[in-house]
Amino acid sequence: MGVAVIAAVATVLGAAPASAAVDAPTAPSSARVLPDPIDCEGCWAPDPSTTWQWQLQGEIDTAVDVQMYDVDGFETRPSTVRELHEAGRAVVCYLSAGSWEEWRPDAADFPRSVKGAKNGWPGERWLDIRKLGVLGPIMQARMDLCAAKGFDAVEFDNVDGYRNRSGFPLTGADQLRYNVYLANQAHRRGLSAVLKNDLGQIRDLLPYFDVALNEQCFQYDECNRLRPFVAAGRAVFTVEYRLELHEFCPQAAELGFSSMRKKLSLRVWRDPCP
């Protein structure tokens, strides 16, 4: 498909053709040694009621009446970020941190050794997240780009490779180390960190991430796993692709989520919960 929405569509269809999710429980907390969280004083900390738009394809429509936009970090122009800021909106930088995408301008920076199995969509492969010496500088450069364009936060996509047939023997502990690294690096740049999916590690990652974003937790009856973010007073943004509003909005309101319905293409169209 040649755009960032590929990863979102893979999630929507559940088990991707070449990369079906597998059970891979995380290691016990006592077995992990994680670095301390890096504070992000003054960073964007949205209210749980924040309204939002998620557009990863097409020319950004800046006229949607919401408080936050989540848009592609590479393709969105700095002028668009400025325009949204001038309208009083926060702007989140979408990056795929766990997959290689052949159309990205830095695609040649990824050596063959870190590119694993296809994730089921043309031009994408899982990354060997254990190799921070290789991936770290690339991801830092991407976050530098987000900061230079004026974004307020980073949405890290595909950060649950340990639960998929990635082509590497990734463990839950590997994923935790990588995700913590990403969040801390975002905070070093004054960017809030948005955790995408990875429901199985929420309790461990809560000290590091400022916001949660989830796809289809109502469809798969997984939304209760996001309660730690709610209890901490942090925003939880959720999207459903197949359910009608009446099938999830009452529960979303009860849980304190900011939820909406989107089409798989992740273009302008949105249907928010009332």
Residue ranges and their predicted role:
Residues 20-32:
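Polybasic, low-complexity, intrinsically disordered segments
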